[in-house]
Amino acid sequence: MKKNILLFWCLLCTVTVWAQADTTQKIIPGRKNSPEQQLKPYVILISVDGLRYDYAEKYGAVNLLSWSAGGVKAESMIPSYPSLTFPNHYSIVTGLYPSHHGLVNNYFYDRSRNDSYSMRNPKTIQEGSWYGGTPLWVLAEQQQMLTASFYWVGSEADIKGVFPTYYYRYNEIIPIDRRIQIVKDWLQLPEESRPHLITFYFPEVDHAGHSYGPDAPQTQQAVRWVDSCLQKLTAAVKETGLPVSYILVSDHGMTNVDVDNTLSMPPAVDTAKFIIPRGSELLMLYAKNKEDIQPVYEKLKKEEQHFKVYLRSNMPSYFHFGEKDDVMGRIGDILLIPDWPRVFHFTPNRKPNPGAHGFDPYKVKDMHASFFAWGPAFKSNLKIPSFENVNVYPIVTKILGLKYTEKIDGTSEVADKILKNP
């Protein structure tokens, strides 16, 4: 009886969340493509969350492999540290490392605001002042080129006062066939109203990888399902007759973790003295009193077993995640990084998910993401070495003829290799 009651309440809560989800398209009125921008080509930037660099071959994503054979495939794409969803999606569209654009984790604390950001809190997700840099859709809109987003980190926020012309707030309710039809509808709008940059997002592979692990049949099914959806998407877009180029990326990979030997909070940490946002593969401690930082750090160094401890000031430079990099002051005072495949876990009555990401991508190859590109802008049958995801930004700006003056961390080296007319 108790189980039935619990199930009822779980279902009720789920239905309530679905009912509250905002599934309406947002349209910013009064915008038009300039005559110059109406002549530009089109880019659809697709993210398949958690699509590890080897999944396409491992699980037989036949459509994706076929398109990349006629286009470009990277050995892998290296995520920025930490290899987590929000920091890396935003790095892809800003060309900046997380420490430079401000989304330093999925959950973090901002000292100057005395407030915390959470990927699960619509209030913070939709507040533009949390986001640094100039995402691609903002750059395009500033130059009178219309954009659309069917989900991307930051696309629901008024970054620099700008939204995409067409966008949706994130939900997983709208059926994929409906989403594809909407993309086609966007591309069939009159030229003055038609978006030239569209972002599109798939969460399913990441969900399966977390819940079942990267080697599970459910993960294979998710990869193949997304591959079939991509075929539907490209077929629908082809009917428009427009010169559309595709860039398909992922934010990170996925790895198996040790669910039986997890790490608890080290005894040296008095949790009453620190603000500690959620974390498993990276734990950031923000001291309420700066005088507590050094003594706790020294105690942690003595307890250092199956994890590494750093101060913000002595993080390895290749992370681009230290005090000198921390433009917005959002990196923790003390950072605890578990040794792969260990994770921090603070829920004793249940095990963590078997699949995870967030580890050092230069030490754990499973963190590497995917990069595929095809369409009229790209060279054919080209395989390139691994590269950092901050280099995607210049690829898109070159295809669309967008100019940027702000300093970014990416370069045009990859774009020059893969574009027909860089």
Language model segments and positions:
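Active-site neighborhoods of enzymes that stabilize oxyanions during catalysis
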Residues: 278-383, 387-398
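Active-site nucleophile/metal-coordination loop of metallo-enzymes that catalyze phosphate/sulfate
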Residues: 21-39, 53-142, 158
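Coil residues (strongly favoring Ser/Thr
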Residues: 22-23, 228, 271
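Metal-dependent active-site segment of extracytoplasmic phospho-/sulfohydrolases and closely related
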Residues: 45, 63, 225-265
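His/Asp/Glu-rich, glycine-adjacent segments
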Residues: 96-213
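A long, amphipathic alpha-helix that forms part
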Residues: 176-188, 205-246, 295-298, 396
